Swiss-Prot record:
It comes from Bacillus licheniformis (strain ATCC 14580 / DSM 13 / JCM 2505 / CCUG 7422 / NBRC 12200 / NCIMB 9375 / NCTC 10341 / NRRL NRS-1264 / Gibson 46). NCBIfam families: PRK13668.1 (NF010189). This is UPF0354 protein BLi03134/BL00047. Pfam families: DUF1444. It comes from the Bacteria. Belongs to the UPF0354 family.
Length: 269
């Protein structure tokens, strides 16, 4: 069966059927908007990305979308989304530069530049989901952008790190997977990158293919670049929130995107 946006929209509507929710399929934008009728809050699902995952994972991909959608809508309805008094629940999240700059309601989101491929957004953790912080929230609660940055950075450094090491063809790869929603965000923790750079025997490279993994690689031979490229593409294709399939060289505290060419050293983008 060939999956189309219309078919996927119909499947999701059936799976998410709820008298309190409304659905709007936008054919031009290839998206499905789901809103709580009582609160007016909701989420917009980008269907092409879900179809790409469905082609690889079939019903498992739809199960994931249904789970996260239900969690998000229930959280929006049942929890306060004020920042005051919940400072410890504010974290930075990494997204691609193609990620929207405004919320579904048209309110500008709070974000900073990061690399040519990525941006830093800020989120209020709601348990099994989160809300991206927008400028309206800042204005309402009297917060400054600098306060958000400092608070999120402090909270990020307090998170526990869970790292798995793997050696492939003489190269060392370190996978950060605490599964707390902020694994990719750990790329913003300068002390982590500085430590790995100090101990690296080869060239230090970094990959942030999706929000739930950070890969740090100690590349000790040319094969390592190919291996990292393959890993990055695989994680990117299977992530719930993809970020970028490109990898980065880490030198002197800076990340520079690179293209990894088979059998060769990478070319700077």
């Amino acid at each position: 069966m060939k999956m189309t946006s219309r078919k996927l929209s119909d499947i999701l509507k059936k799976r998410l059927q709820n008298d309190s929710w409304s659905f709007h399929f936008d054919r031009e934008k290839d998206s499905l908007r789901i809103e709580d009728k009582n609160t007016g809050k909701g989420i917009t699902l980008e269907l092409p990305g879900i179809i790409a995952k469905w082609e690889q994972k079939k019903d498992d991909a739809i199960d994931e979308v249904v789970y996260y959608t239900e969690e998000a809508l229930n959280a929006m309805k049942g929890q306060s989304q004020e920042m005051e008094g919940r400072e410890s629940l504010i974290y930075p999240v990494i997204r691609s530069t193609s990620f929207p700059e405004k919320s579904s309601a048209g309110v500008p989101l709070v974000f900073d530049g990061h690399t040519a491929e990525t941006r830093i957004y800020y989120a209020l953790d709601l348990g099994n989901t989160y809300r991206l912080i927008d400028e309206k929230m800042l204005e309402k609660e009297g917060w400054t952008k600098e306060r958000i940055r400092e608070t999120a950075s402090f909270n990020l450094r307090s998170l526990q790190t869970v790292v798995k090491e793997d050696e492939v063809a003489g190269n060392h790869f370190y996978f950060f997977r605490a599964n707390d929603g902020y694994d990719a965000s750990r790329v913003l923790n300068e002390s982590i990158l500085a430590e790995y750079e100090k101990n690296a025997e080869g060239t230090l490279a970094v990959s942030i293919p999706h929000q739930d993994v950070l890969i740090i690689a100690d590349i000790r031979n040319n094969a390592g670049y190919d291996i990292l490229g393959q890993m990055s593409m695989s994680f990117f294709a299977n992530g719930t929130v993809p970020i970028t399939a490109l990898s980065f060289l880490y030198e002197d505290g800076k990340l520079e995107p690179i293209f990894i060419l088979a059998k060769n050293r990478p070319k700077k983008k």
